């Protein structure tokens, strides 16, 4: 969605086409022109030669984008290791976001972000909020892993919490402003959402080979390398209700001492004083030792797996699977 928005703000919407073939050709050429702004890899150069796409002049009329709503935008493109995505981006074709700024043509943008995903490759790509004088950008952290926030699991009551919040941001406050939803469907989002719903494991099964690194909200919101500055993270009420309710074990280490509570509707209650928040944050620092050792165990798992796979080539195996020595 964010790439599409960047493309539309650059190339506009081409409506003066003769037929579908003309529309397809212009779309390819405009996209090639959009990509020309960045350093391109060898594959994209060959593609442009084969399709005979030449850079088009930047259009003079570009539409505003009224609203962008995204769920846990991440910089993951199939590759389980970040370095592979960087290599692909540099040598083959640019796929990573070039910067963290929201285009001025976008009037409002909302981003629902996962608190609990533990895969380093799935680190969130935040919008930079420095220099923003209004609430044009609203980025809120929700309980659950990547697909618990964005949806995708069959047990989805937790993801409906983020969906309910996002829909609320787009609803019409008065007649002829905002979106109007089918009432029965809209009511289902509210009634079936549950901030005590089941949370999934982002690294279960083969996903355990994704690099282990729980999200650190403070670091993510103050990332100079990514050009992101967010003074006070917004935490959705559901995360704090989930902790307070104790209906299930939930004690995220990522929530900082200084944050703002956001509710889907109405005002959020106060869950802790500033002094209590600071004390909680300091107490949870002890969990950082466990995170450190779990990261060490991840690399031990990776090395042992590589050793097991490579043993097929330097050890002598009998047909029944018994190792009889070096090859």
Where are these regions (language model features)?
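Active-site- or binding-pocket-proximal scaffold segments within functional domains
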Residues: 1-327
């Amino acid at each position: 969605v964010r790439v599409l928005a960047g493309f539309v703000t650059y190339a506009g919407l081409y409506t003066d086409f003769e037929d579908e073939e003309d529309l397809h050709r212009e779309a390819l050429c405009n996209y090639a022109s959009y990509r020309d702004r960045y350093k391109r890899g060898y594959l994209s150069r060959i593609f442009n030669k084969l399709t005979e796409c030449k850079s088009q002049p930047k259009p003079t009329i570009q539409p505003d984008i009224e609203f962008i709503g995204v769920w846990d935008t991440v910089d993951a493109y199939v590759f389980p290791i970040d370095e592979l995505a960087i290599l692909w981006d540099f040598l083959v074709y640019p796929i990573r976001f070039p910067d963290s700024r929201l285009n001025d043509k976008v009037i409002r943008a909302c981003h629902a972000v996962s608190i609990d995903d533990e895969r380093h490759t799935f680190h969130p790509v935040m919008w930079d909020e420095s220099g923003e004088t209004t609430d044009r950008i609203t980025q809120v952290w929700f309980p659950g892993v990547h697909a618990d926030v964005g949806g995708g699991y069959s047990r989805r009551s937790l993801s409906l919490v983020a969906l309910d919040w996002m829909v609320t941001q787009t609803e019409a406050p008065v007649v002829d402003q905002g979106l109007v939803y089918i009432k029965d469907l809209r009511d289902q989002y509210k009634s079936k959402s549950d901030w005590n719903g089941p949370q999934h494991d982002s690294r279960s099964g083969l996903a355990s080979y994704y690099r282990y690194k729980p999200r650190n909200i403070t670091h993510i919101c103050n990332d100079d390398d990514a050009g992101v500055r967010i003074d006070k993270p917004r935490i959705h009420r559901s995360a704090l209700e989930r902790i307070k309710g104790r209906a299930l074990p939930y004690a995220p280490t990522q929530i900082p001492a200084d944050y703002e509570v956001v509710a889907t509707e109405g005002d959020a209650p106060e869950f802790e004083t500033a002094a209590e928040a600071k004390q909680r944050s300091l107490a949870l620092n002890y969990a950082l030792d466990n995170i450190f050792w779990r990261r060490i165990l991840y690399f031990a798992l990776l090395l042992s797996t590589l050793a097991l796979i490579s043993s097929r080539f330097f050890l002598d195996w009998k047909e029944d699977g018994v190792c009889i020595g070096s090859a």
